[in-house]
C-alpha cells in the first residue's frame, strides 16, 4: 500500500522487489501475503501487470479501467482482432460460474472451460478476456499454486471497501507515489500512474499542502511530507530485479543512469533487466 502499486509482469522478480524493501528482507512474507490475498496481482493503472494492496484495488481499478480498456481495444482494432461486447459478457458469465465458491484456477484451466462453453480460447483471446475481467473488477489473482498464476473472483477474495470519489482517489494515488518515489516530477507521476497530464496536475494540487517542492535542472521536484528517504546516498550495493520501481517508476531516469547507458538496463520496447546499484547510481 505504501508504494501504491509495483509493476509485476515478471512474477518472480516483483516478489524480490517487494521482499527487499521489507524491514526484514525476504520472499516468504511476500508469498504468504500473495497467497492470502493481502497483495494482489492484476492489470491496473497501465495495460500491464501490477501488484496492489487488496484495500486499494477497487478504487485504483475505477480510476484506470477505462484507459486500459481503450488501450486494449485500440490495439485489437489495429490488428484486426476485435472481440465483441457479447463475447466479453459471455466470458464474464462463465468466469462467475467456474470460480464461484472461492476457487482459484489457472489460465489454462479457465481456457478449457471457455472452450466447452463455445468461446475462443487461444492465447490471444484468453489474454483479452482475462484482462477485461480484471479491469471490470470481476477477477484478480487467486491463491498461489507454485509458479503458476491463478485467478479468483475479486468480490470473494477482497472484503467490501468504502467507495472513493474521483478526487479522493486522485489524491490518494498522488500521496502513494510521492511518499514512495520522491523526489519526482509531474511528468514522472503522469508516466507511472497512466494519468493524462491534466489529471496528474490536479492530483498534485489536491495534496499540495503535504508536498515540498524544489526547482532543479529546470524542473519542479516534489517530496511528500511522509517520504522516508533522508536523501543521502549510502555506500551499500543493491541488486535490483528487472522492472524495479527504482527505474521503471520514472519517465526520466538520467539522474541514476546516463542516457547513453539506457540500452544496458532496458530496451526500447519496454523490457527491463536486473541492475546493480551503488550509491544510488546504476553501475552494472
Residue ranges and their predicted role:
Residues 35-44, 48-49, 134-144, 208-215:
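A short, conserved structural fragment
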Residues 24-32, 120-132, 197-204:
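Short amphipathic alpha-helical interaction segments
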Residues 237, 245, 252-284:
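Low-complexity, glycine/alanine/valine/leucine- and proline-rich hydrophobic stretches
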Residues 206, 210-260:
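Non-catalytic regulatory appendages
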Residues 170-228:
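Active-site-proximal binding-pocket segments
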Residues 86-103, 166-182, 204:
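Positively charged, polyanion-binding regions of nucleic-acid-associated proteins
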Residues 51-57, 145-167, 221-230:
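Short, cationic-aromatic polyanion-contact patches
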Residues 1-108, 112-122, 259:
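Phosphate-backbone binding and catalysis cores of DNA-processing enzymes
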Amino acid at each position: 500500500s505504501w508504494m501504491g502499486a509495483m509493476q509485476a509482469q515478471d512474477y518472480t522478480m516483483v516478489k524480490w522487489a517487494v521482499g527487499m524493501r521489507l524491514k526484514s528482507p525476504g520472499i516468504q512474507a511476500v508469498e504468504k501475503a500473495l497467497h492470502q490475498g493481502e497483495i494482489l496481482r492484476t492489470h491496473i493503472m497501465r495495460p500491464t501487470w501490477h501488484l496492489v494492496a487488496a484495500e486499494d484495488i477497487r478504487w485504483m481499478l475505477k480510476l484506470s479501467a477505462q484507459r486500459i480498456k481503450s488501450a486494449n481495444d485500440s490495439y485489437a482494432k489495429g490488428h484486426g482482432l476485435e472481440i465483441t461486447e457479447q463475447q466479453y459478457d459471455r466470458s464474464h458469465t462463465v468466469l462467475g460460474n467456474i470460480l464461484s465458491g472461492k476457487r482459484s484456477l489457472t489460465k489454462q484451466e479457465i481456457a478449457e472451460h471457455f472452450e466447452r462453453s463455445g468461446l475462443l480460447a487461444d492465447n490471444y483471446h484468453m489474454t483479452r478476456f482475462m484482462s477485461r475481467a480484471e479491469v471490470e473488477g470481476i477477477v484478480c489473482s487467486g491463491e498461489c499454486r507454485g509458479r503458476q498464476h491463478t485467478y479468483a473472483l475479486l468480490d470473494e477474495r477482497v472484503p467490501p471497501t468504502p467507495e472513493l470519489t474521483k478526487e479522493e482517489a486522485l489524491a490518494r494515488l498522488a500521496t502513494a507515489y510521492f511518499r514512495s518515489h520522491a523526489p519526482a516530477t509531474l511528468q514522472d507521476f503522469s508516466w507511472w500512474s497512466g494519468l493524462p497530464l491534466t489529471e496528474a496536475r490536479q492530483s498534485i494540487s489536491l495534496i499540495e499542502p503535504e508536498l515540498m517542492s524544489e526547482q532543479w535542472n529546470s524542473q519542479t521536484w516534489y517530496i511528500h511530507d511522509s517520504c522516508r528517504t533522508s536523501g543521502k546516498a549510502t555506500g551499500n550495493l543493491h541488486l535490483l530485479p528487472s522492472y524495479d520501481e527504482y527505474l521503471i517508476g520514472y519517465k526520466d531516469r538520467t539522474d541514476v543512469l546516463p542516457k547513453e547507458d539506457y540500452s544496458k538496463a532496458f530496451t526500447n520496447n519496454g523490457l527491463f533487466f536486473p541492475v546493480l546499484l551503488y550509491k544510488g547510481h546504476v553501475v552494472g
